[in-house]
Amino acid sequence: MPKTNEPSRPTPPTSSREDGGGGSSVHPANVLNELSGEEWLYFTKSVWSTAYPSELGHERRRAHGANKPPRLMARLIEFFTRTGELVLDPFAGVGGTLLGAAIARGPRRAIGFEIEPRWVRIFETVVAEALASRDGEGPLLADLGPADPGGPRRFDPSGIELRLGDALELLPTLAEASIDFVATDPPYNVQLRQTMAGGPLAARFPNRRTDYAMVTNDPADLANSADYGAYLDRMGCVFGELARVLRPGRYAVVIVRDAYQDGRYVFTAADLAARAAAAGLVPKGDLIWYQAGTRLRPYGYPRVFVPNIAHQHILVFRKEARRSRRGERGGRPAR
């Protein structure tokens, strides 16, 4: 079980990446991660276009309509942490973040919270199957290019744990400044019972129907908030807890999708960014994640414009370290 009552101990920087780094050395001043300069630069592109294959139990995980690819989460984890550091996902779903920690080049520890028992069971099944894959040698991942070369990958779930419960109840159990990185995919908005064509329109426009359904009956589920304002208020409480448990100088990533509800576009990412900033998490970037192959639906056709939202926002925040009287931290200018 990952420990949260003491700071983790990062592994000293290595001289080069053993897999996927092209032999490029790690800069001796790099204390954030174990990436080469080339890998670091590639990560900072503000638009990511991905088409992930079905791997790591995707056929099971896809039951969750917003499951996140472990390869994507591993990429984030490898940039914002070092081997052995502790990652938190307070809205873990079927465990994409935890699986990403287990396949990271240099495994990380990870804690996840999930309110829905069904998703926890799926995660546990996926872990068991991944451990048994290729006679215990770990998964064989597809080559996705220089940013994610794939190949044989060690699967080490010994440091990951998914806890069943409400994030707002479990977050206070974590020690202050005990987490090295937060990576999460919260409910995007208040769930609507009907987001596509229904009733008499369902028969006429079957291509507008969807099997996307993740609504729980638990009132603690943020997606069951009374309205959008209540949802934002509860997310503000979450951000306050994340700012408390995150170590100074470390990062939090929140993946969120804007919405179109009641005839208007909802800038959910901007609203959540404002709540995070109010809680003390400083905005550092917005990486646009475009999921190639997203199915397009004729929502407003043939009368009005309604967007097909095929991208998500990977919002990057930082809990700034305290500055000295000279406006510096750790002997270096704050950035």
Regions found by a protein language model. Name each.
Residues 2-335:
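Class I S-adenosyl-L-methionine-dependent methyltransferase catalytic core
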